[in-house]
Amino acid sequence: MKRVTGIGGIFFKAKDPVALRAWYQKHLGVNVQPWGGAAFVWADDAGNAYKGTTIWNIGDANNDYYAPSKSSFMINYRVADLAALLKALREEGCQVLEKTDDSEYGKFGWVMDPEGNKVELWQPPPGQ
């Protein structure tokens, strides 16, 4: 079974998300959108876009989306078959969170790594 197929997103908290987003936009050219992040469209070596994006987002330090992790970041990994991967991780003794989510954005599940970081696993909707 193929497990991780790519990075779907990088999410981190900031004490002053507005100022930090502005810094990234000014100094690194990140095209920060009103929702607080950017979507990097995938391209091949020739620069031709193809289906897939990597999300980059700065959130407020007080949000609890990363709970139970105490980390200031979370990485979202693309996976081919979320249900099969979560089952395999449970069988391997990993701390898989019970909650899953199925929305128009795809299927989501979470596992805690050995250092207490919450890892988001994302199965994109068909066609992505």
Where are each of the predicted segments found?
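Residues that cap or initiate secondary-structure elements
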Residues: 18, 46, 81-83, 127
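Core segments of cupin and vicinal oxygen chelate
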Residues: 2-5, 11-56, 91
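Short linear motifs in intrinsically disordered
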Residues: 28-31, 77-78, 98-101
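A generic fold-level signal
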Residues: 5, 50, 69-70, 103
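Vicinal oxygen chelate
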Residues: 1-15, 35, 61-128
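Short amphipathic beta-strand starts and helix->beta connectors
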Residues: 56-61, 94
